[in-house]
C-alpha cells in the first residue's frame, strides 16, 4: 500500500513538473494581446504629471487620484480664445464620504483600452469614467456596495481676468512679441438648475484682426475665414442626484482657482455625473438654447451611448494593431514596451477622432500644469509651448501619417479638412501680394490661414515683401503643405475613397509653385524658366535647415510625386482641363540633385544653399515621405549612401521629438539601425504614463514623437513598391510580433511571427497574397537587388 502511495506521489510530482514545463514554454511563446497592455496602477498619483489619458470623439481628460480625491482636467478640440490659446475647459474634483480611497492598500486604476474607459476601484467602490465618442458628453459612474455621498466640484482658474506676460505668451499666437497688454479674459461660471454652467466667449476683436492688419490683408478681410470672433465654448455639469452646494477658493500647484460644488441629495450606492460640452460661433442666447436642447435630447436618445462607444473602441482596435515581444520572453522588456506604447499612443490619437480641429503636435488634449515640464514655467494649466491655434506643418504631419497604415482614415478628416477650409485665405494671399494664382501656405500656420504673427516678424524693413515671413528659419518654406496633399491622395490609394473634393486644393498648391517661381524669375531677369525649361526654385528651403536653397530636393520630390499621383486619377476623377495643366506643369519640374562623399553618390539637400539653420535631413525626404527611393525601387544604393556617408545626416541623427531617423532606417531596410532608433523612440518615457513623451523640441506629451515612432514601427513591418507588399523589410528575426496593417488597394495584412516563423498570414482581399514578398532576415544586398 505504501509503495503504491509513493508511486502515486512520484507520478503526480512528475505530472505537475511536466505541466509547469509546458505552461512555461507556452507562456514564453505568447505574444501579448491588447488587454496585456492596459496600464494598471496600484498606488495613487502625486500630481497631474502622473495622470492617465482618457477621451473620445473630440474630448480628452487627464485622470488621477491624489490624496484620496479623484481629479480630471478636461479639454476639447477647437477651444481657442481671443489670442489663440487652446484653453482647457476646467478641472473636476470628486470627493466621497465615507472615503473608499483613503487607504494605501487595495487601490487600482486601469485604462481599459479595448472599451476605452478608465476604472478606479478600492474598498468595494468602483468609479468608471468614459467619454461618448458620438456626442460631447463626459460620464462618471459610481457603483459602491455601501452608500456614499459624492461631492463633484468644477474648478476654474479663469474665474478672473489674468494678465499674460513674458513666456506665458508662448501658449498663444503672440509668442515673444505681444502687442500691448495680453489678458486671458475670465469665463462665465454659475449654478443653474442644480448644475454648473461654464463658458468662455471670445470678443469680436481677436488676434485674427491684429494679424490681418500686420500682414496687409485688410482689403480682403471681409472675404476671409475668421474662426475666432465670438467663438463660445463650455458646457454644463449635472447629475440626477445632485444639488448645488456652494463655492470655495483654493490654490492648486501654482494657480489659484474657484470651485463650484455639487453634492449628492442623499448618499447612494449608484451615482452618475455628466458634463455636456458645446462650442459654436453664434450669439450667446443661441448658444445657451442649443446647449440646453443638446442636454434634453441626450436624455431621450443617449440610452445606447455607452454600448455605441464600446463598439466604436472595439472596432478601432480590431482595425489595426502591433503587438510585440522578444522571442522566448515573458518580461516587459524593451520590445514589449514599444508594442505597448504603440497601442497607448494610438489610443491618445483616437480620443480626437472627430475633432473640428486636428490633434495638436504639442500636447494634444493631454497637457497639464507646465511646472511639471519646466519648473520655471509657473503658469496656468492652459499653457503649452508653441501656441494653441498655430499648426506647424512639419510636426502635424507626423501625427497624421501613421493613420494611413493603421487604416484610421475617418480620423484623418480633421487634419485634411482643416487645410481645405483655409484654401480661400491662402489663395487670397497670392492674389493680394503677387497678383497670381495658387494657395500660399506657410510652415507655421494660424488656424485662419495666415503665418503666425510673431514668426512673420513685427520689426521688418519697410520695403520687405509683405507676403514673406521675415524669419531665418521659415523664409521660403512653402512646400510642407504637400505632405497633407499626399494624405488626401492616400485616402483613395489605400481606402478607395472619392477624393474629388480635394482636387482643386491640391492643384492650387501646385499652381502656387508654378506661378510664384516664374514670377520671381521674371523679377530677376527676362526668362521665367531655366535653359532646360524647368522652374528655378530659388529662393527655396530644404525644411528649416538648408536656407536660401536653389532647387531643394524636398520640394522637387513633393512636386514630382503629387503631380504624378494626380495624373493617375481617372478621367472621371480629374477634368481634362486639370489633366492638361498638370501634364504641362510636370515638364517644368526640375530633376533631383546629387553630391558625393568619398566617391559615394548621395542625394543632395539642394542644388545649392547659403546656410544651415536647423537639423532636419531633407536630403532623405525622397526616401520618406516621398518614396522615390526605397526597397524594390531603382538605385536604393544612392539613398543608402546618403544615410551612411552624408556628414550632416550623421551629425543630425537622433530619436528625440520629431526626428525621423527611425523611419529613414526602416524605409532603407536597415534592420539593426531601425531597431535601435525605434527602441529609443518608442521606449517608456520618464513619466508614469509611458507614452507621455517629451518635451523634446516641443511639449508634453509630444505627439510628433509618438507619431514618428508609430510610422517607424509600421515601416519596419510593411512596405510597398510596384504593386508588391514587402513583409518585415527591417524587422529583427528575434522579435515576435502580431500585427494588422493596411496597404494600398483596400488591403489589410495580418501576420503573426513567432520564433522567426510565420504562424499567421491573413490577407484581405485574398488575391493580393500573390503580391507578398517576405524579407525577414534578408541581407542588405538582397534588398538592394530586389526588383
Describe the role of every protein-language-model region.
Residues 21, 47, 331, 335, ...:
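Short, charged/polar micro-motifs that form catalytic or ligand-binding hotspots
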Residues 309, 341-344, 348, 395, ...:
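Alpha-helical packing segments of well-folded alpha/beta enzyme cores
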Residues 1-30:
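Bacterial Sec-dependent N-terminal signal peptides
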Residues 326, 347-352, 398-410, 483-496, ...:
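Well-ordered alpha-helical scaffold segments within catalytic/enzyme domains
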Residues 367-389, 441-503, 514-584, 759:
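The feature captures the catalytic groove of carbohydrate-active enzymes
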Residues 30-458, 556, 578-648, 690, ...:
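Aromatic-residue-lined binding/catalytic grooves and analogous aromatic/hydrophobic interfacial grooves
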Residues 339-340, 390-395, 407, 475-483, ...:
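Aromatic- and histidine-enriched alpha-helix N-cap/loop-to-helix transition segments
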Residues 486-520, 581-610, 629-749, 753-754:
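Non-catalytic carbohydrate-binding regions of carbohydrate-active enzymes
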Amino acid at each position: 500500500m505504501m509503495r503504491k502511495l509513493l508511486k502515486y506521489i512520484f507520478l503526480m510530482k512528475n505530472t505537475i513538473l511536466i505541466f509547469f514545463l509546458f505552461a512555461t514554454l507556452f507562456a514564453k511563446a505568447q505574444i501579448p494581446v491588447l488587454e496585456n497592455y492596459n496600464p494598471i496602477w496600484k498606488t495613487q498619483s502625486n500630481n497631474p504629471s502622473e495622470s492617465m489619458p482618457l477621451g473620445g470623439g473630440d474630448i480628452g481628460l487627464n485622470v488621477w487620484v491624489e490624496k484620496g480625491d479623484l481629479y480630471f482636467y478636461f479639454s476639447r478640440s477647437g477651444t481657442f480664445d481671443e489670442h489663440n490659446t487652446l484653453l482647457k475647459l476646467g478641472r473636476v474634483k470628486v470627493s466621497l464620504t465615507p472615503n473608499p480611497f483613503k487607504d494605501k492598500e487595495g487601490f487600482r486604476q486601469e485604462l481599459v483600452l479595448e472599451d476605452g474607459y478608465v476604472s478606479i476601484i478600492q474598498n468595494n467602490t468602483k468609479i468608471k469614467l468614459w467619454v461618448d465618442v458620438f456626442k460631447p458628453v463626459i460620464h462618471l459612474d459610481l457603483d459602491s456596495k455601501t452608500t456614499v455621498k459624492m461631492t463633484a466640484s468644477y474648478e476654474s482658474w479663469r474665474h478672473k481676468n489674468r494678465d499674460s506676460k513674458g513666456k506665458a505668451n508662448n501658449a498663444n499666437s503672440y509668442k515673444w512679441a505681444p502687442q500691448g497688454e495680453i489678458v486671458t479674459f475670465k469665463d462665465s461660471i454659475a449654478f443653474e438648475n442644480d448644475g454648473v454652467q461654464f463658458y468662455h466667449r471670445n470678443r469680436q476683436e481677436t488676434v485674427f484682426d491684429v494679424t490681418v492688419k500686420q500682414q496687409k490683408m485688410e482689403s480682403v478681410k471681409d472675404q476671409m475665414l475668421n474662426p475666432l470672433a465670438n467663438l463660445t465654448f463650455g458646457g454644463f455639469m449635472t447629475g440626477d442626484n445632485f444639488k448645488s452646494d456652494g463655492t470655495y477658493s483654493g490654490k492648486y500647484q501654482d494657480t489659484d482657482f474657484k470651485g463650484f460644488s455639487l453634492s449628492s441629495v442623499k448618499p447612494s450606492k449608484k451615482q452618475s455625473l455628466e458634463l455636456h460640452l458645446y462650442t459654436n460661433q453664434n450669439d450667446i442666447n443661441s448658444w445657451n438654447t442649443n446647449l440646453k436642447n443638446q442636454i434634453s435630447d441626450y436624455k431621450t436618445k443617449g440610452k445606447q451611448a455607452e454600448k455605441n462607444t464600446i463598439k466604436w473602441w472595439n472596432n478601432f482596435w480590431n482595425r489595426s494593431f502591433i503587438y510585440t515581444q522578444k522571442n522566448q520572453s515573458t518580461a516587459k522588456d524593451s520590445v514589449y514596451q514599444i508594442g505597448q506604447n504603440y497601442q497607448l499612443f494610438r489610443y491618445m490619437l483616437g480620443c480626437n477622432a472627430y475633432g473640428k480641429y486636428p490633434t495638436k503636435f504639442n500636447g494634444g488634449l493631454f497637457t497639464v500644469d507646465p511646472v511639471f515640464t519646466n519648473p520655471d514655467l509657473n503658469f496656468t494649466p492652459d499653457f503649452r509651448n508653441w501656441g494653441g491655434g498655430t499648426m506647424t506643418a512639419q510636426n502635424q504631419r507626423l501625427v497624421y501619417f501613421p493613420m494611413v497604415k493603421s487604416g484610421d482614415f475617418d480620423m484623418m478628416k480633421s487634419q485634411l479638412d482643416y487645410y481645405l477650409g483655409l484654401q480661400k485665405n491662402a489663395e487670397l494671399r497670392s492674389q493680394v501680394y503677387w497678383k497670381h494664382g495658387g494657395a500660399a501656405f506657410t510652415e507655421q500656420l494660424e488656424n485662419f490661414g495666415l503665418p503666425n504673427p510673431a514668426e512673420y516678424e513685427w520689426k521688418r524693413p519697410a520695403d520687405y515683401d509683405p507676403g514673406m515671413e521675415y524669419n531665418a528659419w521659415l523664409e521660403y518654406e512653402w512646400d510642407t503643405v504637400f505632405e497633407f496633399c499626399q494624405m488626401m491622395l492616400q485616402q483613395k490609394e489605400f481606402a478607395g475613397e472619392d477624393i474629388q473634393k480635394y482636387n482643386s486644393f491640391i492643384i492650387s498648391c501646385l499652381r502656387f509653385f508654378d506661378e510664384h517661381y516664374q514670377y520671381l524669375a521674371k523679377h530677376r531677369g527676362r526668362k521665367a524658366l531655366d535653359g532646360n525649361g524647368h522652374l528655378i526654385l530659388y529662393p527655396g528651403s530644404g525644411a528649416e535647415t538648408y536656407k536660401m536653397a536653389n532647387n531643394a530636393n524636398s520640394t522637387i520630390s513633393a512636386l514630382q510625386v503629387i503631380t504624378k499621383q494626380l495624373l493617375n486619377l481617372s478621367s472621371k476623377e480629374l477634368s481634362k482641363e486639370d489633366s492638361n495643366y498638370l501634364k504641362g506643369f510636370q515638364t517644368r519640374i526640375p530633376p533631383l540633385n546629387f553630391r558625393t562623399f568619398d566617391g559615394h553618390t548621395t542625394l543632395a539637400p539642394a542644388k545649392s544653399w547659403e546656410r544651415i539653420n536647423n537639423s532636419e535631413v531633407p536630403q532623405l525626404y525622397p526616401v520618406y515621405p516621398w518614396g522615390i527611393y526605397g526597397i524594390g525601387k531603382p538605385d536604393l544604393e544612392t539613398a543608402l549612401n546618403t544615410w551612411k556617408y552624408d556628414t550632416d545626416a550623421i551629425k543630425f541623427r537622433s530619436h528625440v521629438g520629431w526626428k525621423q531617423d527611425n523611419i529613414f532606417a526602416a524605409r532603407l531596410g536597415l534592420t539593426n539601425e531601425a531597431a535601435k532608433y525605434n527602441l529609443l523612440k518608442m521606449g517608456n518615457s520618464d513619466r508614469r504614463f509611458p507614452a507621455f513623451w517629451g518635451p523634446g523640441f516641443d511639449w508634453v506629451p509630444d505627439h510628433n514623437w509618438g507619431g514618428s515612432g508609430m510610422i517607424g514601427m509600421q515601416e519596419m513591418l510593411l512596405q510597398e513598391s510596384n504593386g508588391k507588399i514587402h513583409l518585415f523589410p527591417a524587422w529583427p528575426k528575434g522579435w515576435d510580433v502580431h500585427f494588422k496593417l493596411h496597404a494600398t488597394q483596400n488591403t489589410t495584412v495580418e501576420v503573426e511571427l513567432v520564433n522567426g516563423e510565420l504562424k499567421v498570414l491573413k490577407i484581405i482581399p485574398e488575391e493580393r497574397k500573390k503580391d507578398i514578398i517576405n524579407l525577414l532576415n534578408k541581407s542588405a544586398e538582397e534588398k538592394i537587388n530586389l526588383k
